Design a protein with these regions (language model features):
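Extended hydrophobic
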Residues: 34, 81-96, 201-237
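Gram-negative host-targeted secretion-system effectors, predominantly Type III and Type IV
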Residues: 105-108
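Non-catalytic, conformational "gating/processing" segments within enzyme and secreted inhibitor domains
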Residues: 1-99, 117-202
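Short beta-strands and strand-coil junctions in structured, solvent-facing domains, enriched
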Residues: 16, 102-103, 227
């Protein structure tokens, strides 16, 4: 069963996420494992990135090589500045730099308000490191806190998809993202395991957004106003 789930995961993310389940994650009470995936791959639309040969500082204690380019849009609110750069398929990457240095939460950035801002500008210069990372998160506690307690309890009702009385025992999500001067690959797989119930003429306005310290990012579908991927980058190691 575990090998079957992982084979599906590998196939549906084009090998970007070859595995999500370990054998010890399933037991004799495991009845169902529901999985879904999201896969994204695209090159950049225009204005390619230039890659530096020299390393520069990221934050206070790290160094990395940076890419620079001209962005397509600029956003700003009281909490952050951001650049948007288009992919070749009507989606875009949005790099968000908090105005306050140090750690931050995504809620503090008011991303919805940020994307609705219309600051005055003529051009935006953008700078960021290449990205290559993978994260794994167990989402059960988060989902319970936002109101989905019943699916984890004996009150859960999955009679439409299961013959036995079952409840959700775990919700595991793995995400992988690779971004460089050529484009972006990103994938996410979520596995929900269920158990049987027993347990004007003026000078041009040039804006700069340099992601040289912890920042946030979106892969955004502006046509449908949907965020496909969202994350924070706190380290480049």
């Amino acid at each position: 069963t575990c090998n079957t789930i992982n084979a599906w995961c590998n196939e549906n993310t084009d090998g970007l996420i070859p595995e999500i389940m370990k054998p010890d994650m399933l037991n004799e009470n495991s009845e169902l494992c529901l999985t879904n995936s999201l896969y994204f791959e695209s090159g950049w639309s225009q204005d390619p990135w230039d890659v530096s040969d020299e390393k520069e500082k990221f934050g206070d204690n790290e160094e990395t090589k940076y890419m620079t380019s001209i962005g397509d849009n600029y956003y700003e609110n009281d909490a952050a500045t951001a650049f948007e750069k288009y992919y070749a398929n009507n989606l875009s990457f949005i790099g968000i730099l908090p105005k306050a240095e140090g750690d931050f939460t995504l809620d503090e950035l008011d991303i919805e308000g940020l994307l609705e801002s219309e600051p005055e500008y003529d051009e935006v210069n953008c700078k960021m490191p290449k990205l290559n990372f993978e994260t794994t998160a167990e989402l059960s506690d988060i989902l319970s806190r936002i109101g989905l307690e019943n699916v984890f309890s004996d009150d859960a009702d999955f009679s439409g998809i299961a013959d036995k009385a079952v409840h959700v025992s775990s919700v595991l999500q793995k995400t992988k993202l690779e971004l460089d001067e050529n484009g972006t690959k990103a994938a996410a797989v979520t596995a929900v395991t269920m158990e049987c119930m027993s347990a004007m003429d003026t000078d041009p306005i040039i804006k700069d957004v340099e992601l040289t310290r912890p920042f946030a990012f979106l892969i955004y579908d502006s046509a449908n106003e949907e965020v496909l991927f969202m994350g924070k980058v706190l380290t480049v190691q």
